[in-house]
C-alpha cells in the first residue's frame, strides 16, 4: 500500500504546521516513522494509523477521539497491568486525581470488571468531590485531607496520577507495608513536589509505571490487532 495525499492518520504528532517523516514499511493499517531522531522513544510513539482502516472511526468524532483515545487507552493498560500481576495480591486500589480522565476511565473499567472483588478509592480535591461521587466510578471518594480515614490492614495498590509527592507520602504513611505496589502514572498537580521528594517511605518503593511497557507485553502476547479490539 502507498501513502496517498489526503490520507488522515492518527498518532502522536508535534505541535507544528508540518512534520517530515521517513515511513518504514507501509501496511493497510498504517506505518512507522523511522527517523533516527525518533529512535530514542518507545516504538508506540512512532506508529501512525490510517483512519480509514480504523474500526469505529467516525470523522464527526475526531476531536473526541484525539482527546479521549490516549487517555482511555492508558486506563485500559493500567487495568491490564493489574490483571497481569494479579493485583499484587491486593484487594484495594487507591487512585489520586480521581477527576482526571485517565483515572475516571480506570475507575470505570475496574467497576465494570471487578466490582465486588477489588475496592477502588478515588482521591480528589474538596471542590471536585461531589462531581467525582456523581460519576459512580469508584467505591469510595475521599479528599486528599481525608487520607487518614482510609481503613488500614488491607493490601492496597496505589496509582498516582496527581504526581503529588506529599499525597503519596501521606498514603504510604497511612497504609505502610500493606502497599505491595505504588506506581506513578501522571502529574496533574504540575506545581506539586517532584517524584521521589520523600525518601524511605514505608511499603513498596514508588516507581514509574510505563504504558509503553504494557503495550509491548500485550503485543507480544495477543498482537496489536487483538489489543486494539479489547481496548
Language-model-derived ranges and their functions:
Residues 1-231:
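Terminal helix/beta-alpha structural elements that buttress the NAD(P)+-binding lobe
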Amino acid at each position: 500500500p502507498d501513502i496517498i495525499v489526503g490520507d488522515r492518520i492518527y498518532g502522536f504528532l508535534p505541535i507544528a504546521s508540518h512534520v517530515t517523516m521517513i515511513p518504514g514499511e507501509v501496511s493497510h493499517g498504517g506505518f512507522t516513522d523511522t527517523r533516527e531522531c525518533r529512535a530514542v522513544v518507545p516504538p508506540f510513539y512512532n506508529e501512525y494509523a490510517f483512519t480509514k482502516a480504523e474500526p469505529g472511526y467516525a470523522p464527526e468524532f475526531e476531536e473526541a477521539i484525539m482527546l479521549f483515545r490516549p487517555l482511555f487507552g492508558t486506563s485500559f493498560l493500567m487495568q491490564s497491568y493489574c490483571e497481569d500481576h494479579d493485583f499484587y495480591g491486593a484487594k484495594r486500589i487507591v487512585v489520586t486525581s480521581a477527576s482526571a480522565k485517565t483515572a475516571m476511565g480506570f475507575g470505570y473499567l475496574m467497576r465494570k470488571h471487578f466490582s465486588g472483588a477489588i475496592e477502588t478509592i478515588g482521591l480528589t480535591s474538596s471542590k471536585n468531590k461531589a462531581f467525582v461521587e456523581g460519576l459512580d466510578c469508584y467505591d469510595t471518594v475521599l479528599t486528599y485531607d481525608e487520607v487518614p480515614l482510609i481503613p488500614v490492614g488491607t493490601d492496597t495498590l496505589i496509582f498516582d496520577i496527581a504526581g503529588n509527592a506529599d499525597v503519596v507520602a501521606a498514603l504510604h504513611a497511612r497504609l505502610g507495608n500493606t502497599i505491595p505496589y505504588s506506581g506513578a502514572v501522571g502529574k496533574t498537580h504540575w506545581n506539586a513536589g517532584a517524584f521521589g521528594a520523600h525518601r524511605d517511605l514505608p511499603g513498596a518503593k514508588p516507581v514509574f509505571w510505563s504504558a509503553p511497557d504494557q503495550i509491548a507485553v500485550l503485543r507480544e502476547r495477543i498482537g496489536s490487532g487483538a489489543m486494539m479490539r479489547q481496548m
